[in-house]
From Swiss-Prot:
Catalyzes the attachment of alanine to tRNA(Ala) in a two-step reaction: alanine is first activated by ATP to form Ala-AMP and then transferred to the acceptor end of tRNA(Ala). Also edits incorrectly charged Ser-tRNA(Ala) and Gly-tRNA(Ala) via its editing domain. PROSITE patterns: AA_TRNA_LIGASE_II_ALA. Belongs to the class-II aminoacyl-tRNA synthetase family. Its EC number is 6.1.1.7. Zn(2+) binds at H564, H568, C666, H670. Binds 1 zinc ion per subunit. Its cofactor is Zn(2+). Coiled coil: none annotated. It is found in: Cytoplasm. This is Alanine--tRNA ligase. Keywords: Aminoacyl-tRNA synthetase, ATP-binding, Cytoplasm, Ligase, Metal-binding, Nucleotide-binding, Protein biosynthesis, RNA-binding, tRNA-binding, Zinc. GO terms for molecular function: alanine-tRNA ligase activity; aminoacyl-tRNA deacylase activity; ATP binding; tRNA binding; zinc ion binding. It comes from the Bacteria.
Length: 875
């Protein structure tokens, strides 16, 4: 029996033997494709090739593509664990032809791989195929050339309510490449319910689609007409987990080797004995998507891809809770996953430390609110009417306890309860409206500037040009032929020394001029293939066709270059100190400072910051040569050049190196030697999102100015404390010691006063059914003193209930004390929470002592009344 890893390798080997280039799986984060949340099909990385916008050095390719379907249009999350074949993560085996072979070879290859004893050796009688109703060519190839009998070939027409809307007709969109497809199904046997494609029972599990072969042969126009493509192409997909189930003689994907290994590990970690428990399936599936998403640079957050990852992690943690997991367990599955995925697990092994740290931190964070959220949900579900949970409760769970809607839906599903999703969405929209700040945006020239040709960038060699031609002018969002003095405009030149903002580096400033005109450039931006010089005409007039000189603000450019080169040194130093998991997530390089965002799941210590600074400054002092070289991207990767995550690179790339220390793909401007940076100083380090840290730093003169400013602060502080700077720490320590001593003495006085007040309050106790009760408002008394008073009164009363409320600086403090003999009747935690609800707060504690806080002092009277009423009714 073939393992899943062996099937994956067999597929790639087969198509390599047929002249296909084996291409590595692309990232789960699509490159520059805003239409996709995650890579969800093998063809995603070849989309531009199919559209004719990109060319590859090969016309045949094969891949084992990792895919995620959770969130967005393709969202399988809610079904995962409850069906045999839904997953958040799966591998798609694919072979592709870019204007090379077509239907005959695509069908022949598929049949050979599936049925040949040399490869998979499936029984031919177990296979059925579908073709598009009018695709006689594909039908004849299957029937007459391959030899599939007619009763095993099914024609599928337009079954989705519109022309060409069919399970067997594929389209990239409303317009563009499209064509019929043929699908191959496997018959699991008559002991399993289900019917053939096209029958009412087709959704059963007997006949399972294992391969889809798409024939891209038409270009659909906006009017619906179909034009034949000059070079038709082929896109295929076969789910690895599905074909593994077939070859391993199981009906459910969760019974294949990969999942069974993971399921057994989950059971071991959680103590679950029943290996058919659906929660085991959920967790085994979710560790795959979570680990690979983190490996591909996604970190848990509250928006976009990061929020989908957070939802998956929290769903897995909740199912672990159902299984009885008492401690963090999810991250412990990573080594097992890396092993069982074999070659496809290499990226998980490389990023293992980052994945484990991220998952553990996220699980610990969610565990703090999971229990309370589940109690709230359980209480709400016990009061549900008509089997519908209200949208506002679902939203409160989301907003307060971090419960994604699908996690709440999971719990409801187990009790046959649905959620009022419209009500949830109303609450969500109301929150968005409250949070939305008013914005006033200018003209978006990205949608305005359409210019033939491109701007040639000369800024690597020079910061000035004596001659450049104005090819277009834009003002107020419109193309114009001429601009006059005082007008703001965007100037497009045929060539320029000005760097357009990209890669985190801000755009250049400066001037362009003629003999009679001067245009001040305040910013430079890239608009597709052209560069826009944004600014104001200070004198004269400027027309399309004019010849101008161009001069960059050289001093500013050099300051920007110093910060950009320092960013590369910082990146390399971070990886040396923190580890290879560090990867850039964003940057800003200006003339005054640099900002660098990077993956790092833990806080960075002060000692590590000092070490990072020292490494960067050592490289600056060594005055290393900074080199730039244009080369083939594969050669750059072999040299170890780091690429910016999420960027899409062409076949030729620019490599910036700092001999023996840093090498990165980069299109920015840099110093000639590291000594030109002068000095590097970190001014701040912080977290900006879960697993993402930010360092801000200054260089050269800005670093000296920053240090001088810090020295001034030290000098002023020393003067105020009548000390010198060398003795400043000692002086502050002495003052702190004095302050602590005075604070301790003050607290002792307060406690003495509180005990005296407690003696007086004991006399005010009332009896409820022979039980002593004190309910009082004591404003201005802090929590610590209240606790002393309660303990003293419990001793004095011997048996009783003491309740105090105090308002200090508009904050409400509540405390309830119950003597040990009464905790069976009165739970301090329940009573304090009853009061806390009245003052907009929450609290907790032991049965004999509990505390709460609140933000609504005007409701303290109501809280005490509610407490008294409860005691009257329950004692």
């Amino acid at each position: 029996m073939k393992t899943t890893a062996q099937i994956r390798q067999s597929y790639l080997d087969f198509f390599h033997s047929k002249g296909h280039q084996v291409v590595e799986s692309s990232s789960l984060v699509p490159h520059n494709d805003p239409t996709l949340l995650f890579t969800n099909a093998g063809m995603n990385q070849f989309k531009d090739v199919f559209l004719g916008m990109d060319k590859r050095p090969y016309t045949r390719a094969t891949t084992a593509q990792r895919c995620v379907r959770a969130g967005g249009k393709h969202n399988d999350l809610e079904n995962v664990g409850y069906t045999a074949r839904h997953h958040t993560f799966f591998e798609m085996l694919g072979n592709f032809s870019f204007g090379d072979y077509f239907k005959h070879d695509a069908i022949a290859y598929g049949w050979e791989f599936l049925t040949s004893p040399q490869w998979l050796g499936l029984p031919k009688e177990k296979l059925y195929v579908t073709v598009y109703e009018t695709d006689d060519e594909a039908y004849d190839i299957w029937n007459k050339e391959v030899g599939v009998p007619a009763d095993h070939i099914i024609r599928i027409g337009d079954n989705k309510g519109a022309p060409y809307a069919s399970d067997n007709f594929w389209a990239m969109g409303d317009t563009g490449p499209c064509g019929p497809c043929t699908e191959i199904f496997y018959d699991h046997g008559e002991h399993i319910w289900g019917g053939l494609p096209g029958t009412p029972e087709e959704d059963g599990d007997r006949y399972i689609e294992i391969w889809n072969i798409v024939f891209m042969q038409f270009n659909r126009h906006a009017d619906g007409t179909m034009e034949k493509l000059p070079k038709p192409s082929v896109d295929t997909g076969m789910g690895l987990e599905r074909i593994a189930a077939v070859l391993q003689h199981v009906n459910s994907n969760y019974d294949i080797d990969i999942f069974q290994t993971l399921i057994k590990k989950v059971a071991q970690l959680t103590g679950e004995k029943d290996l058919t428990n659906k929660s085991l399936r959920v967790i085994a599936d979710h560790i795959r998507s979570c680990a690979y998403l983190i490996a591909d640079g996604v970190m848990p957050s509250n928006e976009g891809r990061g929020y989908v990852l957070r939802r998956i992690i929290r769903r897995a943690v909740r199912h672990g809770h159902l299984l009885g997991a008492k401690e963090t367990f999810f991250y412990k599955l990573v080594p097992t996953l890396a092993d069982v995925m074999e070659h496809a697990g290499e990226i998980v092994n490389q990023k293992r430390a980052l994945i484990e740290k991220t998952l553990k931190a996220e699980e610990e964070q969610f565990a703090r609110t999971l229990e309370r959220g589940l109690l709230l949900l359980d209480d709400a579900l016990s009061q549900v009417k008509d089997n519908v949970l209200s949208g506002d409760v679902a939203f409160k769970l989301y907003d307060t306890y971090g419960f994604p809607l699908d996690l709440t839906a999971d719990v409801c599903r187990e009790r046959n309860i649905t959620i009022d999703e419209k009500g949830f969405e109303r609450e969500m929209q109301a929150q968005r409206a409250r949070a939305q700040a008013s914005s006033n945006f200018g003209v978006d020239y990205n949608n305005v500037i359409k210019v033939d040709g491109q701007t040639e960038f000369k800024g690597y060699e020079t910061t000035s040009l004596s001659s450049a031609k104005v090819v277009a002018l834009f003002t107020d969002g419109k193309s114009v032929e001429r601009v006059q003095s005082g007008e703001n405009a965007v100037v497009i030149l045929d060539r320029t020394p000005f760097y357009g903002e990209s890669g985190g580096q801000i755009g250049d400033t400066g001037y362009i001029a003629t003999d009679l005109a001067a245009f001040r450039i305040n910013d430079t931006q890239k608009y597709g293939q052209v560069t826009g010089h944004i600014g104001q005409l200070e004198s004269g007039s400027l027309s399309v066709g004019d010849t101008v000189s161009a001069q960059v603000d050289t001093e500013r450019r050099l300051a920007v270059a110093a910060n950009h080169s320092a960013t590369h040194l910082l990146h390399a130093a971070l990886r040396k100190v923190l580890g290879d998991h560090v990867a850039q997530k964003g940057s800003l390089v200006s003339e005054s400072a640099l900002r660098f965002d990077f993956i790092q799941p833990e806080a960075i210590s002060k000692e590590q910051i000092i070490e990072i600074e020292a490494i960067v400054n050592r490289q600056i002092r060594e005055n290393i040569s900074v080199t730039t070289e244009v080369m083939d991207i594969e050669a750059a990767k072999q040299k170890g050049a780091m690429a910016l995550f999420g960027e899409k690179y062409g076949d030729l790339v620019r490599v910036v190196g700092m001999t023996g220390f840093s090498i990165e793909l980069c299109g920015g401007t840099h110093v000639k030697r590291t000594g030109d940076i002068g000095l590097f100083k970190v001014v701040s380090e912080s977290a900006i999102a879960a697993g993402i840290r930010r360092i801000e730093a200054v260089t050269a003169e800005n670093a000296i100015n920053w240090l001088n400013n810090q020295q001034n602060i030290l000098n002023q502080s020393a003067d105020l404390l009548k000390s010198d700077t060398a003795s400043l720490v000692e002086k502050i320590q002495q003052l702190q010691d004095k302050a602590k001593k005075a604070e301790k003495e003050l607290q002792q006085l307060k406690e003495k006063a509180a005990m005296q007040a407690g003696s007086d309050l004991a006399k005010s106790a009332v009896k409820i059914n022979d039980i002593s009760v004190i309910v009082q408002q004591l404003d201005g008394i802090e929590t610590k003193s209240l606790r002393v008073m309660v303990d003293d009164l419990k001793n004095q009363l011997g048996s009783g209930v003491i309740v105090f409320a105090s308002v200090v600086e508009d904050k409400v403090n509540l405390i309830v004390g119950v003597t040990a003999d009464l905790t069976g009747k009165v739970k301090a935690g329940e009573l304090v929470n009853l009061m806390a609800q009245q003052v907009g707060g929450k609290g907790g504690g032991r049965p004999d002592m509990a505390m709460a806080g609140g933000s609504q002092p005007e409701n303290v009277g109501a809280a005490l009344s509610a407490c008294s009423d409860w005691l009257e009714s329950n004692l």
